[in-house]
Curated annotation (Swiss-Prot):
This is ATP synthase subunit beta. ATP binds at residues 160-167. Produces ATP from ADP in the presence of a proton gradient across the membrane. The catalytic sites are hosted primarily by the beta subunits. PROSITE patterns: ATPASE_ALPHA_BETA. Belongs to the ATPase alpha/beta chains family. Coiled coil: none annotated. It is found in: Cell inner membrane. It comes from Anaplasma phagocytophilum (strain HZ). One of its GO terms (molecular function) is proton-transporting ATP synthase activity, rotational mechanism. Its EC number is 7.1.2.2. GO terms for cellular component: plasma membrane; proton-transporting ATP synthase complex.
Length: 479
């Protein structure tokens, strides 16, 4: 956080609750809402920063703590910085790992004195400055590129319950896209496991996205507020990362990739803070300001005439319920939704993307072309028909189906297995080398499948392969 802000007053702590602190400014200098306060002394070896959330009257402000309040007591002094929390931006941040306050946590040292700092609270670009995305972003993952393609400069949500593969999928997307991407990537770790943050950093170093010898030649910035941190830090870390991404978009005209894992934790931390601030909860116990908080963040993630931000957001779905207010509020802001299904993961098909639930605004003739659109819709039609026949198959068996339906079911099962794919990031666990499948190969492969060109191949040949040529080779090996 910027240390050069001018002081406007000193306050005294009058009440301490977990993650929320009341500070009294008896002699004037009352801070504005969203302004930062810094402690005069250190706690656990570092200054504690508070963000003003409410004015309670009589010179008392209620603040959200950005760090642990252990050791804090009544009477402790806090200085009004006169400005919101600010984080470093620009090329000096590349290859580094930061916390919510923009402090480096990678043990490499400070970012330097000649670094620009920007407030984490900013307005979304005006409508006249925004640009509509129409170019498809190829991910190399068959099920996504075919059925729910991503737009360059668009917003993507990866929805899924616990343990269905959201983080693995987002790491594979980083591996596939960030390597080939010429611009910069910013990753926001919001309330997820510290181990996963460490794994991602190591993965980026190995793939060359982060250069440990010459940091400024790196292509990525990591900002972490993990699940062991107070709710204030988890609530603001996405904004800290977004501020860094906005700088690359606006000041440098870059096409930026912005990854968030996990947006649900952003909502969850807001709910914790809202309860501590004494607000009346709304549906399912969430904060009454859920829609406006989500909107304030999501509206900043957009593409302008200067540059673009393509965002991929992992969104945890509590109890696999997509109607829960947290995931359903996110749906409104997204161009593409990739829904991960527990039923598909139980079949051992990974990535466990639901081909019928996942949607994309890009899946139109105008964007992807007639051939791609027709193949995708035919794949969905076959899978939907198979789904509707499953009850009949379970009760009466395959023999009761017409010959036409039997062929369609066999084709659907092959398509279902062909939607699986070995990942680069999972290679160490599965032993299968990861595969990047081009869009042309994906469309060609599925076109052949829906036309019945590969009806003679066994189902097993289509499981965990890349393109159709690999499936044909596997079928020969199985004979």
């Amino acid at each position: 956080m910027n240390q050069d802000s001018g002081c406007e007053g000193v306050g005294e702590v009058v009440r301490v609750m977990p993650a929320v602190v009341d500070v009294e400014f008896a002699h004037g200098g009352l801070p504005d809402i969203l302004h930062a306060l810094k402690s005069e002394k250190d706690y656990q070896g570092k200054q504690l920063v508070l963000e003003v959330a409410q004015h309670l009257g009589d010179g008392v402000v209620r603040c959200v703590a950005m760090g642990s309040t252990d050791g804090l007591s009544r009477g402790d002094k806090f200085i009004n910085t006169g400005s919101p929390i600010s984080v470093p931006v620009g090329r000096k941040t590349l290859g580094r790992v930061f916390d919510v306050l923009g402090e480096p946590i990678d043990g490499v040292g400070d970012v330097g004195a000649d670094v620009e700092y920007h407030s984490i609270h900013a307005h979304a670009p005006k409508l006249s400055e925004q640009k509509v995305a129409t170019e498809v972003l190829v991910t190399g993952i068959k099920v996504i590129d075919l059925l729910a393609p991503y737009l360059k400069g668009g917003k993507v949500g990866l929805f899924g319950g616990a343990g269905v593969g959201k983080t693995v999928l987002i790491m594979e997307l980083i591996s596939n896209i960030a390597r080939a991407h010429k611009g910069f990537s910013v990753f926001a770790g919001v309330g997820e496991r510290t181990r996963e943050g460490n794994d991602l950093y190591r993965e980026m170093v190995e793939s060359g996205v982060i250069n440990e010898d010459e940091r400024e030649k790196s292509q990525a910035v990591l900002v972490y507020g993990q699940m062991n941190e107070p709710p204030g830090a988890r609530m603001r870390v996405a904004l800290s990362a977004l501020t860094m991404a906005e700088y690359f978009r606006d000041a440098e005209g870059q096409d930026v990739l912005f990854f968030v894992d996990n947006v649900f934790r952003f909502t969850q931390s807001g709910s914790e803070v809202s309860a501590l601030l004494g607000r009346v909860p709304s549906a399912v116990g969430y904060q009454p300001t859920l829609a406006s908080e989500m909107g304030a963040m999501q509206e900043r993630i957009t593409s302008t005439h200067k540059g673009s931000i393509t965002s991929v957001q992992a969104i945890y779905v509590p109890a696999d319920d997509l109607t829960d207010p947290a995931p359903s509020t996110s749906f409104l802001h997204l161009d593409s939704t990739t829904v991960l299904s527990r039923q598909i993961s139980e079949l051992g098909i990974y990535p466990a993307v639901d081909p019928l639930d996942s949607t994309s605004q890009a899946l139109s003739v105008d964007v992807v072309g007639a051939e791609h659109y027709e193949v995708a819709r035919e794949v969905q039609r076959i899978l939907q028909t198979y789904k509707s026949l499953q009850d009949i198959i379970a009760i009466l068996g395959m023999d009761e189906l017409s010959q036409e339906d039997k062929i369609l079911v066999a084709r659907a099962r092959k398509i279902q297995r062909f939607l699986s794919q070995p990942f680069h990031v999972a290679e160490v666990f599965t032993g299968n080398p990861g595969v990047f499948v081009s869009l042309e190969d994906t469309v060609r492969s599925f076109k052949g499948l829906v036309e019945g060109q590969y009806d003679d191949l066994p189902e097993a040949a289509f499981y965990m392969v890349g393109g159709i040529d690999a499936a044909v080779e596997k079928a020969k090996a199985l004979k």
